[in-house]
């Protein structure tokens, strides 16, 4: 496993900055303690389920979502989004706010990282340690992230890439919280389809599906007109 808040080497892992093994993982988000490591090990041995994305392709990194949409998708407040952008914790990779009237545009990967940050915060991890973990994740592509599971004991963040590493961590005798990046990605893929996206290259925007109420209003307006 890779310990993401120091450069210390674990018994079975690599130091931060080395490329860890890309074993296929598919954990559900869960908590665990020593003694119940069998569940984690069983999950770790299974492959990533197919259909992570609807068309089995990587999300278009030229499609961005404005700040308010990114907040709703990731489940955070706009105040959090703005603070994390200003402190360079999670910066929009497609377009930053520059001057009056400009809008930040967040990519699929940006919003995925926002979700991960939120979940790590909810477990009590400090922003300092989260920043180290985010810097590590930022180096990965979207497909690489699908093979990562993050675990935390409330202080340290670990990246696990095999069942053996999960067992080692759970046998430490303290509770841990697991975040399956692949699970967060599937969840995000389903939710993000309901939001309007903008193309950074000036191409056609991706409109959110029209809800039933809006459709009825439009139909009524046509009749009146």
Swiss-Prot record:
Q: Which Gene3D superfamilies match?
A: 1.10.1660.10
Keywords, A to Z, come to: DNA-binding, Transcription, Transcription regulation
GO molecular function annotation: DNA binding; DNA-binding transcription factor activity
Q: Where is the composition biased (Basic and acidic residues)?
A: 20-29
Q: Does the keyword Transcription apply?
A: yes
**Where is region (Disordered) located?**
1-48, 201-225
Q: Does the keyword Protein biosynthesis apply?
A: no
Q: What is the top-level taxon of the source organism? A: Bacteria
Q: Where is the HTH merR-type domain?
A: 64-136
Q: Name one Pfam family in it.
A: MerR_1
This chain's protein is named Uncharacterized HTH-type transcriptional regulator Rv1830
Q: Which organism is it from?
A: Mycobacterium tuberculosis (strain ATCC 25618 / H37Rv)
**Biological classification of the source:** Bacteria, Bacillati, Actinomycetota, Actinomycetes, Mycobacteriales
């Amino acid at each position: 496993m890779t310990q993401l808040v120091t450069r210390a080497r674990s018994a079975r892992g690599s130091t931060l900055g080395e490329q860890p093994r890309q074993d296929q993982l598919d954990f559900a988000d869960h908590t665990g303690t020593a003694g119940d490591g069998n569940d984690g090990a069983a999950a770790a041995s299974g492959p990533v389920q197919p259909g992570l994305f609807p068309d089995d392709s990587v999300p278009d990194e030229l499609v961005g979502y404005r700040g308010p949409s990114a907040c709703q998708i990731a489940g955070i407040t706009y105040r959090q989004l703005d603070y994390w952008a200003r402190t360079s914790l999670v910066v929009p990779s497609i377009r930053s706010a520059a001057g009056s009237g400009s809008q930040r545009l967040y990519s699929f990967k940006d919003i995925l990282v926002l979700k991960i940050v939120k979940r790590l915060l909810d477990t009590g991890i400090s922003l300092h340690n989260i920043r180290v973990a985010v810097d590590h994740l930022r180096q990965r592509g979207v497909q690489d992230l699908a093979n990562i599971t993050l675990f935390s004991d409330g202080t340290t963040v670990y990246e696990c890439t095999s069942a053996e590493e999960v067992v080692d961590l759970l046998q430490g005798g303290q509770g841990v919280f697991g975040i399956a990046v692949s699970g967060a990605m599937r969840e995000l893929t389903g939710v993000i389809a309901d939001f309007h996206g903008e193309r950074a290259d000036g191409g056609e925007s991706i409109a959110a599906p029209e809800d039933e109420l809006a459709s009825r209003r439009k139909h009524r307006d046509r009749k009146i007109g």
